[in-house]
């Protein structure tokens, strides 16, 4: 039987061995907080100008109609790791991570030139279409790109605002802001390294792993865990050992999560991922998977990969050929092996006695979900 948690605010959460049940309750609470926050922001923006209604509509859809909510879920797990139970204000603070993620994805799609996100047009494509429908002057593509920069920036501002206005204690907010700042810096650093890697002539597995750690590992899992933990226990003398234990769990899991993402970016089912088949190949992503394939394949395979990697007009047949080269190189099997090794390391770390036992089933279920997902 799962553990039942209740708070004065009326939230009921379950933590048991079934992520689908317990995570759904937390996800619903996160969505409710985001919905309330976005409604308030809509009122403010539309009081400025009616032309901002499409901005509100786009961000509402982006934040409320999809997403795995992984970062707030890991934040929730970090809170539980102290042995305490999150209340409404705590959930609101953790929900701010979804706004930071929206900023990251909107800007990432713009930098990659991605046409879709979760099976729908990416933000810059949506506003490119809006420009055309309204017969505005200038270039539709440039308008869409400018809008995406601004909507991403707005989501970043809102993330900070939602955290500040969450209602958590002053001590918890001070501790949380330190983690929040580090997380944002690490995200931007990882993103820059990812962009720069595309220009490197020699591809290196170690460099790609470093990017995976900062762009995803720390930002997606380790720092959200830390954020939840320090909101629950802001005293550094008390939370320092826990943060260390959560890092031992979160860092390998974050890298495994990104490696799974690398595989899905090339081999994922478009109906499930919401992205075209082989999208990472067209975008020229220099992932760990690609770096391994370039190291392991034959000279002819390497030439073929380098010739077509980053070609936006790749045909389905060419995508299938590149998939074959990558698979035959042994890189797919090697990445799967590495994912399993990292997941085992993470699962072992979850059993550290510093982590409260009520968080353990949730952590283990999240780890399985992060590494065995299909989207």
What residue ranges belong to the model's regions?
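Conserved N-terminal diphosphate/IPP-binding helix and adjacent helical/loop segment
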Residues: 1-97, 102, 106-107, 111-141, ...
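All-alpha helical catalytic cores of prenyl diphosphate-utilizing isoprenoid enzymes
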Residues: 44-49, 62-71, 146-158, 164-267
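A glycine-biased, small/acidic residue-tolerant capping/turn segment at secondary-structure junctions
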Residues: 49, 260-273, 303-309, 320, ...
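Residue-level signal for inorganic ion chemistry
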Residues: 74, 159, 190, 290, ...
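Acidic/histidine metal-binding catalytic segments
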Residues: 89, 168-178, 185, 238-242, ...
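Active-site alpha-helical segments that house and flank conserved acidic catalytic motifs
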Residues: 90-118, 178-188, 218, 226-229, ...
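Divalent-cation-assisted or electrostatically stabilized phosphate/pyrophosphate-binding catalytic cores
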Residues: 118-152, 201-218, 244, 270-296, ...
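C-terminal charged capping/lid subdomain of soluble metabolic enzymes
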Residues: 321-375
């Amino acid at each position: 039987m799962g553990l039942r948690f209740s708070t004065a605010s009326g939230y009921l959460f379950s933590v048991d061995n079934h992520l689908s049940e317990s995570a759904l309750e937390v996800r619903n609470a996160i969505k409710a907080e985001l919905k309330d926050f976005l409604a308030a922001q809509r009122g403010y923006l539309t009081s400025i100008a009616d032309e901002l209604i499409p901005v509100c509509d786009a961000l509402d859809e982006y934040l409320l109609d999809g997403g795995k909510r992984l970062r707030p879920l890991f934040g929730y797990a970090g809170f539980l790791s102290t042995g305490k139970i999150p209340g409404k204000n705590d959930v609101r603070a953790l929900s701010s991570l979804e706004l930071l993620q929206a900023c990251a994805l909107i800007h990432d799609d713009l930098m990659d030139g991605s046409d879709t996100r979760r099976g729908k047009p990416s933000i810059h494509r949506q506003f490119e279409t809006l420009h055309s429908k309204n017969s505005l002057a200038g270039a539709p593509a440039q308008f869409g790109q400018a809008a995406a920069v601004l909507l991403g920036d707005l989501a970043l501002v809102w993330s900070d605002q939602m955290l500040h206005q969450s209602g958590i204690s002053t001590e918890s907010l001070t501790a949380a802001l330190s983690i929040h700042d580090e997380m944002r810096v690490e995200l931007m650093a990882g993103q820059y390294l990812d962009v720069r890697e595309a220009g490197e002539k020699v591809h290196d597995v170690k460099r790609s792993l470093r990017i995976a750690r900062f762009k995803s590992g720390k930002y997606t899992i380790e720092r959200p865990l830390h954020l939840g933990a320090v909101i629950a226990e802001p005293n550094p003398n008390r939370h320092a050992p826990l943060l260390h234990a959560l890092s031992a769990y979160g860092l390998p899991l974050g890298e495994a999560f990104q490696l799974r993402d690398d595989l899905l970016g090339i081999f994922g089912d478009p109906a499930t991922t919401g992205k075209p088949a082989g999208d990472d190949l067209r975008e020229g992503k220099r992932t760990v998977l690609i770096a391994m394939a370039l190291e392991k394949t034959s000279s002819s395979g390497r030439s073929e990969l380098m010739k077509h990697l980053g070609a936006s007009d790749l045909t389905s047949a060419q995508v299938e050929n590149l998939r074959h080269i990558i698979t035959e190189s042994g890189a797919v099997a090697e990445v799967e092996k590495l994912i399993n090794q990292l997941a085992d390391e993470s699962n072992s770390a979850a059993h550290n006695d510093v982590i409260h036992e009520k968080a353990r089933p949730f952590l283990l279920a999240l780890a399985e979900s992060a590494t065995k997902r299909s989207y």
